[in-house]
């Protein structure tokens, strides 16, 4: 029997479904909100810039090997020099972040018996993760020498973001064997290492490779903020005296490098880590294949150990600037009300409002594009001629640095803001990453049920609506929540190129210098960002509970708080009784 209330209907109370009329209403409201946000950000296009745009695009493909900015270098030499420099500090920063994230996620996961420690570590990480990335880009840039600063920025970013991935992964593991061994040994890490780690090491292996590839692409954004790396050569596109001809070779070097890592990831995932369909009768082949995997993984680990040692040796200077570091932390909790006014340009509520508009436009584009492309580009849902072109376009758009699209198209909005342009471009770029993740989710569904529906005569559209989408719905919503927070950070970070009003405020003050008044103003803007991002994290946490069909009251922390308050009441009651 179907039960219902005003909003939901259900047969099983743990599996409630929103009524169709409310779904339609939510979709209509979302559409209206998107249109209103888009209109609020819209700036007229300067079609007179079409000639300049065409000229820049043509120059991009001339691949000039000389730049008057670097007379002693050819651009091929300089591009590969900066590319190897970027790979070095990305490898070292990602490795350090990976190691830290592994241990902090383990200590703060369900494997940690001391729940107080779990909460303390998670609160610390959530606290720092809510700050805009640009704040710590500034901190490391003023406190450490160039290459060391770049390494620490990558470490910081990798640690905070990988911690969440690892924590979610660990908390969702089947712990049956672990619990049995833990009961015998009473050792957390040893039990984990012997019962679970051998089965999840491949997952961590791929986590590392994905993170390294992602960080190499991400460096072009922090390079726009002045951090050393290959992206500095892309910034020359903003210099009209140099032109776009000097950008072609650095861009090509970046694309070649990222394509190499794409193929490496594919090779590791499909060949090295995939051991299905081994013919056990052919013992010689079996030995070669199993040992090849083991040898390759050890070679990979040793190679990166060697690369990290080499990266440390090649860091040109380990110079620290203690006065700047001390000054930064001394004013970390500062907040200046006097920097604000009722003028829109200096009103923090207006900055946040613009950021909200950008996020609404972005997340709507991400939601639609990623879902459509993941379904149309899935190899199991479509034939080869359909999914290969879409997969190619998705990969091509994903490997081209975001900053190139912003520099190229911003010519149409000279003299006005580019908030809408940046929101759309970054949303399209993030859609390509989400397509990849959703494609993996689609490949993991129960395809026997899909085939049964096909035999029953259901159309392809019906099979997708009735089975495929419901099967990936939880993953889809969880991904969108994650990308919402990630998009806020990206928009603030791209303030260095005018990507957001709040980000521009942080960038301008950050580039002004290391004076105390600049740090005070920077911290004020950063705390505004912190409050906004922290609210998003709380909403993300709450909506994740809804997606997972959990109740707030089921959480351990809430239950224990209730227990503690009850105990305190009993203590006071007993004390009051004894006093009488």
UniProtKB/Swiss-Prot annotation:
Coiled coil: none annotated. PANTHER family: ABC TRANSPORT SYSTEM PERMEASE PROTEIN P69, PHOSPHONATES TRANSPORT SYSTEM PERMEASE PROTEIN. Probably part of a high-affinity transport system. Belongs to the binding-protein-dependent transport system permease family. It comes from Mesomycoplasma hyorhinis. Residues 83-265, 352-540 form the ABC transmembrane type-1 domain. One of its GO terms (cellular component) is plasma membrane. This is ABC transport system permease protein p69. It is found in: Cell membrane. The lineage of its organism: Bacteria, Bacillati, Mycoplasmatota, Mycoplasmoidales, Metamycoplasmataceae. PROSITE patterns: ABC_TM1. GO terms for biological process: transmembrane transport. Its main location: membrane. The chain crosses the membrane at residues 22-42, 83-103, 120-140, 150-170, 214-234, 247-267, 295-315, 349-369, 403-423, 464-484, 490-510, 527-547. The keyword Ribosomal protein does not apply. Keywords: Cell membrane, Membrane, Repeat, Transmembrane, Transmembrane helix, Transport. It is a multi-pass membrane protein.
């Amino acid at each position: 029997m179907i039960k219902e209330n005003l909003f939901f209907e259900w047969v099983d109370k743990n599996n409630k479904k929103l009524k169709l009329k409310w779904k339609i209403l939510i979709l209509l409201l979302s559409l209206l909100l998107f249109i209103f946000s888009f209109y609020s950000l819209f700036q007229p296009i300067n079609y007179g810039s079409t000639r300049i745009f065409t000229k820049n695009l043509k120059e991009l493909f001339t691949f000039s090997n000389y730049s008057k900015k670097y007379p002693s270098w050819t651009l091929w030499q300089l591009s590969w020099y900066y590319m190897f420099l970027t790979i070095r500090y990305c490898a070292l920063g990602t490795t350090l972040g990976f190691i830290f994230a592994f241990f902090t996620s383990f200590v703060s996961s369900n494997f940690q018996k001391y729940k107080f420690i779990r909460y303390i570590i998670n609160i610390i990480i959530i606290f720092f993760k809510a700050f805009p990335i640009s704040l710590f880009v500034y901190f490391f840039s003023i406190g450490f020498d160039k290459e060391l600063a770049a390494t620490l920025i990558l470490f910081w970013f990798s640690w905070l973001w990988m911690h969440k991935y690892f924590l979610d992964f660990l908390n969702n593991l089947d712990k049956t064997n672990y619990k049995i061994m833990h009961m015998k040994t009473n050792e957390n890490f040893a039990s984990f290492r012997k019962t679970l780690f051998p089965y999840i090491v491949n997952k961590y292996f791929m986590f590392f490779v994905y993170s390294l590839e992602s960080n190499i692409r991400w460096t072009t954004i922090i390079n726009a903020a002045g951090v050393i790396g290959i992206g500095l050569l892309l910034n020359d596109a903003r210099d009209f005296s140099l032109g776009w001809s000097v950008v072609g070779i650095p861009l090509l070097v970046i694309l070649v490098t990222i394509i190499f890592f794409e193929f490496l990831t594919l090779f590791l995932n499909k060949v090295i880590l995939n051991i299905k369909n081994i013919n056990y009768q052919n013992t010689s082949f079996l030995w070669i294949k199993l040992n090849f995997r083991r040898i390759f993984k050890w070679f990979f680990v040793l190679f990166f150990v060697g690369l990290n040692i080499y990266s440390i040796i090649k860091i040109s200077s380990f110079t620290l600037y203690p006065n700047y570091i001390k000054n930064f932390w001394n004013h970390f909790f500062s907040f200046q009300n006097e920097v604000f006014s009722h003028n829109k340009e200096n009103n923090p509520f207006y900055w946040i409002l613009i950021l909200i508009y950008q996020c609404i436009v972005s997340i709507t584009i991400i939601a639609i594009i990623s879902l459509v492309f993941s379904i149309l580009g899935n190899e199991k849902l479509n034939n080869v001629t359909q999914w290969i072109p879409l997969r190619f376009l998705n990969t091509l758009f994903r490997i081209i640095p975001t900053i190139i699209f912003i520099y190229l198209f911003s010519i149409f909005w000279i003299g006005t803001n580019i908030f809408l342009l940046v929101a759309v471009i970054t949303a399209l770029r993030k859609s390509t990453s989400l397509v990849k993740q959703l494609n993996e989710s689609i490949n993991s569904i129960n395809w026997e049920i899909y085939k049964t529906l096909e035999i029953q005569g259901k159309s392809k559209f019906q099979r997708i609506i009735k089975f495929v989408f419901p099967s990936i719905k939880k993953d889809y919503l969880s991904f969108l929540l994650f990308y919402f927070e990630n998009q806020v950070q990206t928009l603030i970070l791209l303030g260095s190129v005018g990507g957001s009003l709040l980000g521009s405020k942080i960038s301008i003050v950050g580039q002004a210098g290391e004076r105390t008044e600049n740090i005070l103003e920077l911290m004020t803007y950063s705390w505004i960002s912190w409050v906004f991002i922290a609210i998003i994290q709380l909403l993300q946490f709450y909506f994740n509970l809804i997606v997972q069909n959990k109740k707030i009251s089921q959480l351990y922390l809430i239950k224990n708080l209730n227990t503690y308050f009850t105990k305190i009441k009993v203590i006071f009651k007993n004390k009051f009784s004894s006093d009488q």
